[in-house]
Amino acid sequence: MAFNTETFMLKNQAAIQLYEEVKRQPIFDYHCHLDPKDIFEDHIFDNIVDLWLGGDHYKWRLMRANGISEAEITGPASNLEKFKAFARTLERAYGNPVYHWSAMELKNVFGVNEILTESNAEEIYHRLNHFLKEHKISPRRLIADSKVMFIGTTDHPLDTLEWHKKLAADESFKTVVAPTFRPDEAFIEHRHFVDFITKLGDITQKEITDFSTFIAAMEERIAYFAQNGCRASDISFTEIVFEQTDELELNDLFNKVCEGYIPNQSEISKWQTAVFMELCRLYKKYGFVTQVHFGALRNNHSTIFEKLGADVGVDSLGDQVALTVNMNRLLDSLVKKDSLPKMIWYNLNPAYNIAVANTLANFQANELGVRSYLQFGAGWWFADTKLGMISQMNALAEQGMLANFIGMLTDSRSFLSYQRHDYFRRILCTYLGEWIEEGEVPEDYQALGSMAKDIAYQNAVNYFKN
């Protein structure tokens, strides 16, 4: 069977027919890590390595596994040397999603149909660089060519949102670029917590002396984000915890940490529970969809982390005790306080998929008519694979409503990653097509095609309406 053809990843005739319904759908990319400044300034890319390999820890991780020196990954090697090193890696990467994504990016963006190998790497490298210049490939060009209607960036609570404002005022650019409120530093275990409190007080002109004044300052920033088009928040937790305490202990803990105290795990859990519940109350008040990424064990190779920083390819999926106990207690407490916002839960460890989907199904009741008020998010990071996507959809279909799923997001730092939406759509169509082929659902292409289109695009549009 030929590789990377029009029927790539479409395993049956039903899938091919369903794909015709979704392949031209626009993209609603509600969570990514693109820099809005890059989108606004719209510089033309002049080297494929900067565009394709720069900042891509998926590729870096794979290259290290293939014995590539750090000099050729993140170090001082020339761009051509880095490109050749990646090609040398890619030709051995069968079975890894990076192999598929790379082939799709080369073909669909640059018109390169050959399989990239070490032997043709130099010729393709020069051809790609020529293509970038000849076609004036820039961030906005890639966004427009991919039919991206909405981009949700990931933004620090103290960000001025200068570049979002400029993009919103630019009538020549039709894609909506909305900020996302990401308050990682609001949690006491974060190494920048104390500095964050100081800067938060400065920007809000508030004296932050305890838990309540801290939350009041956070609300001011949330309101500022809301005024500038924000539709969502995001947070990443290593574990989902639920450990309640009173405000007296929170105030004491706040002051001790600000004076240099290192909190223990129970104190970290109490602060996480209290702060997240207050944030959820505010997110509901301001109409933010609340995204929760959980289960990542980060920066495990301490030497690489100390040299290169975070998000460089040395992270793992984690595990935890009492996940569903804590999730149920947390969500139930939010319901009791009328503080449950629309939420998307992204689970990193597929072993918990059924448990997470099952737990979310307990709390779907709402009087707003929102379908799947709590969303089980798409396979994330290490689960952003064929098997990871299928595992997530299996769990959601069996424990909830797959038809209401808001579908794919890039969660990426690369302007080439929109091919992942097409990758997901192909896998989705094969998944639904197998139901038809095996007689598990009626052979109703209108109904299944409509379902596929909803998952590919329309469900997300509807879900993120304020």
From Swiss-Prot:
Domain of life, per lineage: Bacteria
Catalytic reaction(s) noted: D-glucuronate = D-fructuronate; aldehydo-D-galacturonate = keto-D-tagaturonate
InterPro entries hit by this protein: Metal_Hydrolase, Uronate_isomerase
Keywords for this protein: Isomerase
Keyword Isomerase: yes
Biological or metabolic pathway of the protein: Carbohydrate metabolism; pentose and glucuronate interconversion
Molecular function per GO: glucuronate isomerase activity
Pfam families on file: UxaC (PF02614)
E.C. code: 5.3.1.12
Isomerase found in the keyword field: yes
Family: Belongs to the metallo-dependent hydrolases superfamily. Uronate isomerase family.
HAMAP family, per the entry: UxaC (MF_00675)
Protein name: Uronate isomerase
Organism: Streptococcus agalactiae serotype V (strain ATCC BAA-611 / 2603 V/R)
